Amino acid sequence: MNAPTDYLLHLADNALILGQRNAEWCGHGPILEEDIALSNNSLDLIGQARMLYQHAAAQIGGEATEDTLAYFRDVPDFRNYTLCELPHMPLMSATAQGDRDFAMTMARNFLYSSLMVLVWDQLQSSKDPQLAAIAAKSLKEVRYHLRHSRDWLVRLGDGTDESHTKAQAALDQLLPYTQEFWASSPHEAEALANGTGIDIAALRNDWNQIVDEALLEATLQRPADGGFVPTGKQGIHSEHLGFVLAEMQSLARAHPQAVW
């Protein structure tokens, strides 16, 4: 049994867009080790996206490939969490798209990987055998992503006054976006019904425990969830996704028939 195509695209789009964001640190890391670590994180995520796009393309048929799904869909076609597409800087600051705040990046990676260790763990039991195999491989990678981002969040939160302030500001901005994790979507409901997906809302307590334990160690305060629920996985995105796709897709769209 195959998972619904839109469900596969949702998982793939999350990995691709966050992988693309983390790749923006290549050559700009605060220290060489972190430059390499974030580049490797990006490669892991894009590798996960490739496997999922290949699986989805096989179901779609025709001329669909992993490349057409990554490079020739437009903003409304993407089903990623809004959290994954946000820039690396506070949204209200007067900065350019290319500016980077390390605390923002680590906070986002922590919040996302805290979810995905739970998601991939459960998807190992999916009735879609190919998705289950992808989950088993991805789980090993995202466990490292969680450990890496958690260590940095604790280091920043329990560090200097400046690093604590930056970590708290990042958390205050990003954590409300995680409300989208638990909002229902048609493709998730369909995948759950046919046994290929999981009940994402059932993971909320375990995710909260992972987050709260880390914040306690980091001496950070958890902000209120807020009432706004982002709608990225329904195809309604922030303005930031357009900038990500414009850069990521430019070469493929300029030379659509090129063979590399």
Cite the ranges covered by each PLM segment.
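Acidic/His metal-coordination segments adjacent to aromatic residues that form catalytic metal sites
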Residues: M1-D6, F72-R108, L156-H164, L174-G197
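Alpha-helical scaffold segments that form or flank carboxylate-/histidine-based iron centers
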Residues: P4-L8, G29-Q48, T105, Q130-V142
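Amphipathic, well-ordered alpha-helical segments in soluble domains
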Residues: N14-N22, Q48, L52, Y112-V119, ...
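Helix-loop segments that flank and shape redox-cofactor active sites
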Residues: L18-N40, M116-L131
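Domain-scale activation on soluble regions of proteins
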Residues: R21, H55, T82, D121-L123, ...
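Conserved alpha-helical segments that form or flank metal/cofactor-binding pockets of metalloenzymes
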Residues: S42-F78, S149-V154
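Internal, conserved structured core segments that host functional sites
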Residues: L83-H148
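Extended, helix-rich structural scaffolds rather than catalytic motifs
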Residues: T165-W260
